[in-house]
């Protein structure tokens, strides 16, 4: 019954949005600020991604690659209304088998933000322990070696050895696909607002090196894990020549690519996810200062 109610509410939000003219008014507003719809997820079930992309494509949205997004940002190509940008965090296992065929069918490019150490370990540290200990939220402030020591201890005690993330080989194959781009997500999925600037910079540089070695291409974007950073960190990342991808709407006017964290849910139905997308209308601002 709950599922039916959620589906009905989601359908109502989506339908009323389209029929009420809100869609036209919001798209007109996009024409004034050059915004791009940001569709963002982690590890969606294939049917979830398929239904959401299909809904958007059928309503006239055209998904652009990171190269195209940066061309618009830099004024090398004109912005077009109903433009969208699809991104995924972390690079979860099964992407190649489960999600790539959907991208190919709709010809939708996607950007995956990768933390190489987490790829090597096979897990995102928060996801692997949050159900096993109530102490995990205190570990954001710890340096990587101490944090991993605590994570490994909890996993060993709970026999938590299942791989969650795609391995290096899968990511390398994905990076060679014309629809897929890999970008920087720090080296250890670091909380950039909890650790010193120098540590964040070191992780950014190490990720640049590793991903260039894996893929033959040096990343241009860096997405902050957990969506947080400090002003000092943000400035330091820019000085490296990287373009920050931020979760803070306020940063959209600071020369970064502001990627709102009102993401679609990995396991929700179509109309629930359409409701999430339309309520917040996440966007990236491509008119940079």
Which sequence ranges carry the predicted segments?
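C-terminal active-site subregion of NodB/CE4 polysaccharide deacetylases
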Residues: 1-87, 93-94, 177, 194-289
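Metal-dependent polysaccharide deacetylase catalytic core of the NodB/CE4 family, i.e.
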Residues: 39, 82-83, 104-229, 258
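Short, flexible loop segments at the rims of nucleotide/cofactor-binding pockets, characterized by
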Residues: 64, 88, 158-162
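Aromatic-lined substrate-binding rim segments of carbohydrate-active enzymes
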Residues: 81, 89, 100-104
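Active-site flanking residues adjacent to catalytic metal/cofactor-binding acidic residues
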Residues: 88-89, 184
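Short, glycine/acidic-enriched loop or turn micro-motifs at the edges of active sites
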Residues: 92-93, 188
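Membrane-embedded segments
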Residues: 95-99
């Amino acid at each position: 019954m709950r599922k039916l109610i959620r589906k009905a509410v989601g359908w109502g939000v989506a339908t009323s949005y389209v029929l009420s003219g809100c869609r036209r008014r919001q798209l007109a507003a996009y024409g004034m600020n050059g915004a791009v719809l940001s569709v963002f997820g982690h590890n969606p079930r294939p049917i979830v991604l398929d239904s959401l992309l299909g809904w958007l494509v059928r309503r006239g949205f055209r998904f652009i690659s990171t190269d195209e997004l940066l061309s618009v940002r830099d004024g090398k190509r004109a912005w077009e209304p109903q433009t969208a940008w699809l991104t995924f965090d972390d690079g979860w296992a099964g992407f190649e088998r489960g999600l790539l065929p959907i991208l190919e069918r709709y010809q939708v490019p996607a950007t995956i933000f990768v933390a190489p150490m987490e790829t090597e370990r096979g897990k995102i540290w928060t996801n692997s322990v949050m159900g096993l200990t109530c102490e995990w939220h205190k570990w954001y402030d710890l340096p990587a070696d101490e944090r991993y020591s605590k994570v490994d201890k909890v996993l060993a005690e709970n026999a938590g050895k299942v791989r969650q993330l795609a391995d290096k080989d899968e990511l390398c194959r994905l990076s060679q696909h014309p629809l897929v781009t890999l970008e920087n997500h720090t080296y250890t999925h670091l909380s950039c607002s909890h650790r010193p600037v120098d540590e964040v910079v070191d992780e950014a540089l190490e990720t640049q090196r590793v991903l260039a070695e894996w893929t033959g291409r040096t990343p241009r974007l860096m997405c902050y894990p957990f969506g947080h950073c400090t002003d000092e960190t943000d400035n330091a990342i820019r000085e490296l020549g990287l373009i920050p991808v931020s979760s803070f709407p306020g940063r959209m006017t600071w020369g970064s690519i502001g990627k709102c964290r009102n993401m679609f849910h990995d396991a929700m139905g179509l109309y629930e996810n359409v409701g999430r997308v339309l309520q917040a209308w996440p966007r990236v601002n491509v008119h940079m200062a």
